[in-house]
């Protein structure tokens, strides 16, 4: 029996392809289970966790080489059997999440039955964005003005 925990973390301010690497790992682990490399794959599902907020996009390559830039949905959506989890400590903008879910549905990905949101994730509201824009945090910290700062 094999069990894996793969963690993709970065220490750089800005893009370093964490999303692409995470997507590749989900694809690899999912296919390992399908090929029988993991004899207990049903008891060890592939889980793709997103921790963060809509201020950062992660590009992943889906079916047919289509590129997706995701800001809320975990990149593991590319594998139909992956469980998608937005973790505690994440910031969620429901407008962005809804837009991504709809876009993925139109592209042929059914994620609603496998997308979970931790009840301790922070819900961003338009007020958060306004407060950030009205402060000096955008200039001082290089904020993306998405309500996270």
Task: State each model region's role.
Residues 1-148:
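Non-transmembrane, aqueous-exposed alpha-helical and coiled segments at domain scale
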């Amino acid at each position: 029996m094999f069990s894996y925990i793969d963690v993709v973390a970065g220490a750089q301010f800005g893009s370093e392809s964490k999303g692409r690497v995470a997507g590749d790992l989900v694809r690899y682990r999912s296919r390992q289970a399908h090929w029988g490399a993991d004899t207990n794959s049903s008891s060890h599902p592939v889980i793709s966790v997103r921790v963060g907020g809509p201020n950062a996009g992660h590009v992943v390559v889906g079916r047919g080489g289509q590129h997706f830039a995701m800001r809320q949905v975990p990149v593991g959506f590319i594998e139909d059997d992956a469980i998608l989890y937005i973790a505690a400590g994440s910031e969620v903008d429901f407008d962005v999440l809804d837009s991504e879910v709809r876009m993925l549905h139109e592209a042929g990905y059914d994620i609603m039955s496998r997308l979970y949101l931790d009840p301790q994730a922070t819900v961003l509201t338009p007020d958060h964005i306004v407060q950030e824009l009205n402060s000096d945090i955008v200039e001082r910290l290089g904020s993306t003005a998405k309500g996270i700062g």
